[in-house]
Amino acid sequence: MFEKNLEINYLLDFYGDVLSERKRTVLEMYYNDDLSLAEIALDIGISRQGVRDMIKKSEEELLYLEEKLGLCKKFRTIQKKADELLEALEDSHVSTDVRDKVKEFADSVRATI
């Protein structure tokens, strides 16, 4: 359950702007603010079942976007490769100038993504 929450939060960060304002707000209330279905229902004026349905449909929409676009997966891959590059750099016998330039480049790549 915890992993699913993290994944949905991650997808919400990437694709949240694609969702309607209402769907995004409900997901943020549920996952980020840790509100119950009843609390969300009271706040936005629909039934608990309506909130649950909206959350499920929004989750499906986020998962579909990731399946088709793969932006989160690509982002994670780039982050991992940048980390591996820096780790390999620390273990190598490269001059300080080269090491600093590569670190600067890796940091700029991270900042860009």
Regions flagged by a language model, labelled:
Residues 54-57:
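Residues within the DNA-recognition helix of helix-turn-helix
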Residues 59-66:
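C-terminal flanking helix
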